[in-house]
């Protein structure tokens, strides 16, 4: 019995090995046979998970790259200011008869005694203390060249940045943020002469103490709606007056006949 049992085991082992070799030959290249998949199911699942992770990482990297390219394009685009920090109005210079700073579509900058469409300006903040000035009608920015000449620019550049300062007399001065005298470090200011023409900022006569550089902002303030409300004040009730105790009226006394006694003196 023992020999027959051993022979059966030997033949069964041979049959199984031959069947396994045949399956390997029939399977295509690069794909494991069923025996291999049955033997190592964990390995196949790990490979599948790694392949899915690689695909997800590549998919996530592609939108990131696209966003990066978009961000670089936005940085290269022109300056855009937020609409929340804008002030729309005019800048009035009290030099001479008084002029409103105006910007023309052809790039000319001067002053007009009467306010008009060209004198409607929009002042927006660029950074701390630095502002930009744009003409609403001309849609161009006030700029100062390297020679100190005022002109209008279609694009917002560093020449369009001005430093805004508040003076003691409630007027403002606007000096170029990048251009100044190299030797002395004197700033170049936006100024108008008595005839309403723009002065050169590099001129030694253009000083922050002179009225030609003083501008009064005249902004349109939006009318706030009238808020009406009623307040009900509770009426204070007067405390009840204390009740005076009733004093019983005493009955009138009857006049009793008074007896008069006479003193009698006895002598003797």
Curated annotation (Swiss-Prot):
This is Fibroblast growth factor 5. Keywords: Disease variant, Glycoprotein, Growth factor, Mitogen, Proto-oncogene, Secreted, Signal. PROSITE patterns: HBGF_FGF (PS00247). Its main location: secreted. Glycans are attached at residue 110. It is found in: Secreted. One of its GO terms (cellular component) is cytoplasm. SMART domains: FGF. Residues 43-80 have a biased composition (Low complexity). It is linked to Trichomegaly: A morphologic trait characterized by unusually long eyelashes and mild hypertrichosis of eyebrows. It can be observed in association with corneal irritation, cataracts, and hereditary spherocytosis. GO terms for molecular function: fibroblast growth factor receptor binding; growth factor activity. Plays an important role in the regulation of cell proliferation and cell differentiation. Required for normal regulation of the hair growth cycle. Functions as an inhibitor of hair elongation by promoting progression from anagen, the growth phase of the hair follicle, into catagen the apoptosis-induced regression phase. InterPro entries: Fibroblast_GF_fam, IL1/FGF. Residues 1-20 form the signal peptide. Pfam families: FGF (PF00167). The keyword Hydrolase does not apply. Residues 26-81, 233-255 are annotated as: Disordered. Belongs to the heparin-binding growth factors family. Interacts with FGFR1 and FGFR2. Affinity between fibroblast growth factors (FGFs) and their receptors is increased by heparan sulfate glycosaminoglycans that function as coreceptors. One of its GO terms (biological process) is signal transduction involved in regulation of gene expression. It comes from Homo sapiens. It comes from the Eukaryota.
